[in-house]
Amino acid sequence: MEDCCMLPYYTAQSSPAMGMFNTSMGKLQRQLYKGEYTIFRYAPMFESDFIQISKRGEVIDVHNRARMVTMGIVRTSPCLTLPDVMLLARPAAVCDNARCGPATQKRESPPAEILELTRLLPLMFVKITIHNSVKKQLHLKLATGRSFYLQLCPPSDASEDLFVHWENLVYILRPPVEAYSDTRAILAGNTLDSSVLEEVQRSPVGYAMKFCEEKEQFRISRLHMNAEMFGSTYCDYTIEI
């Protein structure tokens, strides 16, 4: 039996995100299922590939290559009605032909299959907004105040508009008035106190963080990305292999 057929669906009856997690498995979820991150092995996940862009929508590249990011939204417990964790990963090795141009926004060929998990972020410390719905761009703001921008890079054989799911996610996690980046809504994570931190530590998210920290082969450090766009904090964990 295929591995993907063995994964259960966590379908809380009151969950507005139920349909999102009943999509087919992506490469990050398949990799986590087969790997040693047991905390995420059976967790339902919705994921897509993105390219990192600037606020003006320009592609951020390194050595003439677009910076690919796989973002996964995870529900760590079947008791939860909403997702609670964001995972960010990047290709461990980039294939020569794996590029995503700003004109087509389609991958010419699949990127390397092996992904490197780089971030585990509690969603309560991340604000996701729609930066540009026409260009399928998202704005992610961390509790530290750091921001970065991602543009959806769907597979060439995609049979549906995946950005619709991301738009739905934005509205599920935030009230409509805060859904777009041009509002002046205040990020709740900017006013963190000890009670919030204690709540996180007792939650499945806190267990996941502790699990990742205790694994000997991993160390917590800053993400190897644009220093002006990323920072390190207690709620912004980076896992290096």
Curated annotation (Swiss-Prot):
Entry superkingdom: Eukaryota
Pfam families per record: GARIL_Rab2_bd
Family: Belongs to the GARIN family.
Protein name: Golgi-associated RAB2 interactor protein 6
Source species: Homo sapiens (Human)
